[in-house]
Amino acid sequence: PDEDAFIRTCEALVEAGHTVTEGSADNAKRRCVTAFATVVDPSGNTIELYWGRELDYTPLISPQGVAGFVTSYQQTGDMGFGHLVLPAPDFDATSTFYTEIIGMGITDILYPPGMEGAKIHFMHANNPRQHSLALFNAPHPLGVVHIMIEVETMDELGRGMDRAKAAGAHFMATLGRHVNDNMCSVYLLAPGGIAVEFGYDGILIDPQTHVATVSTEGDLWGHEYSFPGVED
């Protein structure tokens, strides 16, 4: 959140044996931040740390008329763009990297039904979003399992589904509701091959008092998956 925290985190990474590369001033300017650094986690995912975002406070004007996306709480608190799921074949070391060094907390541990040996750690930052990051204990050819963006109403979700259908997008999962974060969502295949979860109604947690849970079911209902090139 500030320069001191940025420096402390970079120093902790170096102390733990990770190589931290400082970003150039030009690249920081392109990212609209004061400074940033890159590091590779134990599973080979490159991440960036930064501080000092530049803001112009221009409101979002969606070309599709979306009223807004859920990125804050109580009008001021920052919850980020949504969430990101990364592949983590070196699972234990990668989970430790994000919890012990980066400082995230475990929200939920999921053992997906029908996927022998699979495990997902859902992690929260210092804000009420149920998870901002999740780690899946398997490699992924694109380096990203999926991203999630959240809209403010069920009608916005429905209109987005209509636009996706009209555009011929592949639905990787039908409408459903997850168990752990209560998100009502669909999964779409983006042109680059990354899955995008488009959701509504995710729960909020207290990151200071939340106690991690263990789930053996992924969904309350729905979310019938259909992967391209995979026959039933």
State each model region's role.
Residues 17, 21-35, 51-72:
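Asp-box/WD-like beta-propeller blade repeats and closely related beta-sheet repeat scaffolds
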Residues 27-28, 86-130:
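Core segments of cupin and vicinal oxygen chelate
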Residues 33, 80, 117, 129, ...:
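Exposed loop/turn and edge beta-strand positions of beta-sandwich/beta-sheet ligand-binding modules
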Residues 48-50, 96-99, 107, 122-125, ...:
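A structural feature that tracks compact, well-ordered secondary-structure segments
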Residues 52-55, 114, 202-204:
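A short acidic/small-residue loop/turn micro-motif
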Residues 141:
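Long C-terminal interaction/binding lobes of large macromolecular proteins
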